[in-house]
Amino acid sequence: MQTVLALETSCDESAAAVVRHKADGSVEVLASRIASQVEEHALWGGVVPEIASRRHVEALPALVQEVLRESALSISELNAVAATVAPGLAGALMVASVTGRTLAALHQVPFLGIHHLEGHLASAALGEQAPAPPYLVLLVSGGHTELIRVGLNGEMERLGRSHDDAAGEAFDKVARLLGLGYPGGPAIQAIAVSGNAKRFSLPKGRISLRGGGFHPYDFSFSGLKTAMLRTVESCQSSGGDLPLADLAASFEQVVADVLVERAIRCALDHNLTQLVMVGGVAANQRLRLLMAKQGKQHGVAISIAPLAYCTDNAAMIGAAALNRLSRGVLSSSDETGVAARWPLERADALYDASPAF
């Protein structure tokens, strides 16, 4: 059984975890800790990179000690140390990367630099039953909205993406517009529960093809954001209080509709009978229920990352590292740095002898 210490500091969550492969190939989380900075960044209406980096430096050492103590393991007993190295905030990424490399070198164990999105894809393995490839992944988070096909040998192919705002980013911006605070996803979900999702008609943004028609699997949320602004302005011009619950519910519903419709269509068009949903927005209850309902109607088996592992965490980074180890990847180059941007399709380059960055 292989065991990994994993570190995650790509944005505003400091996290450490110890995970291992069990005899049946499933992933067991021995310990997982997260230090959130949400309340501090909420004062600024979003993540402040310099503050995030400083808080990671302060929080990560204690988190590492806690997960090692809880798992009753020393670093020398591990098969590897893993850390997110791309993509994310460069200064924040450096904290986990430098910490992980240092610990690995001191204790003479391999180091694995992990792609953050590969971690999100692996988060589905932290549930009761890990999906077996091939399958389609809907990755929907604050920075990414993508449809990715995972092949039999773990190869990844992007089939759809957002051309502007990610879904999670749209939640944050609309929440700010409605005065609901940060982060937007939980804030909108909380007030939308009591709202009428059919009160306001909002657009389902599409991406035009050069030869005519629309891309069936791509996303656009900028037009929806503009439509929400105009709807709010129209309500304000009528006087009285804003119907916040109805606005939030209408917005939440159209985002869920778009994500589910295009994901299910993509799965069916590519003869994929499994669809996995991961990322922070996958925690949205309306989206989870709609995806499960539509999957059942169309004969597509739906797997959703456990709520505890939808948002950024180190357990998913550990799960991705275990996947790499099981495929014979032993180490990243000691010279590899971090990258604020790095496409998931080029994740294999993180393990080359000659570093990609």
UniProtKB/Swiss-Prot annotation:
As to how many cofactors bind and how, the note says: Binds 1 Fe(2+) ion per subunit.
Q: Does the keyword Transferase apply?
A: yes
Where primarily located? Answer: cytoplasm
Provide the E.C. number(s) assigned to this enzyme. Answer: 2.3.1.234
**HAMAP family from the UniProt entry:** TsaD (MF_01445)
Q: Which CDD domains match?
A: ASKHA_NBD_TsaD_bac
SUPFAM superfamilies, per this entry? Actin-like ATPase domain
Q: Report the protein's function.
A: Required for the formation of a threonylcarbamoyl group on adenosine at position 37 (t(6)A37) in tRNAs that read codons beginning with adenine. Is involved in the transfer of the threonylcarbamoyl moiety of threonylcarbamoyl-AMP (TC-AMP) to the N6 group of A37, together with TsaE and TsaB. TsaD likely plays a direct catalytic role in this reaction.
Q: Alphabetically, which GO biological process terms does the record hold? A: tRNA threonylcarbamoyladenosine modification
Top-level taxon of origin: Bacteria
Any single Pfam family the record assigns to this protein: TsaD
Catalysed reaction(s) here are:
L-threonylcarbamoyladenylate + adenosine(37) in tRNA = N(6)-L-threonylcarbamoyladenosine(37) in tRNA + AMP + H(+)
Under NCBIfam families, the record lists: gcp_kae1 (TIGR00329), T6A_TsaD_YgjD (TIGR03723)
Q: What is this protein called?
A: tRNA N6-adenosine threonylcarbamoyltransferase
| Subcellular locations according to the entry | Cytoplasm
Q: Which GO terms describe its molecular function?
A: iron ion binding; N(6)-L-threonylcarbamoyladenine synthase activity
What family, per the record? Belongs to the KAE1 / TsaD family.
Q: Which InterPro entries match?
A: ATPase_NBD (IPR043129), Gcp-like_dom (IPR000905), KAE1/TsaD (IPR017861), Peptidase_M22_CS (IPR017860), TsaD (IPR022450)
Q: Which residues bind substrate?
A: L139, V140, S141, G142, G143, D172, G185, N284
Q: Where does Fe cation bind?
A: H116, H120, D312
Keywords for the protein's UniProt record, in alphabetical order: Acyltransferase, Cytoplasm, Iron, Metal-binding, Transferase, tRNA processing
Q: Which species does the entry assign this protein to?
A: Synechococcus sp. (strain CC9902)
GO cellular component terms attached to this protein's record: cytoplasm
Q: What class of enzyme is it?
A: transferase
Cofactor(s) of this protein = Fe(2+)
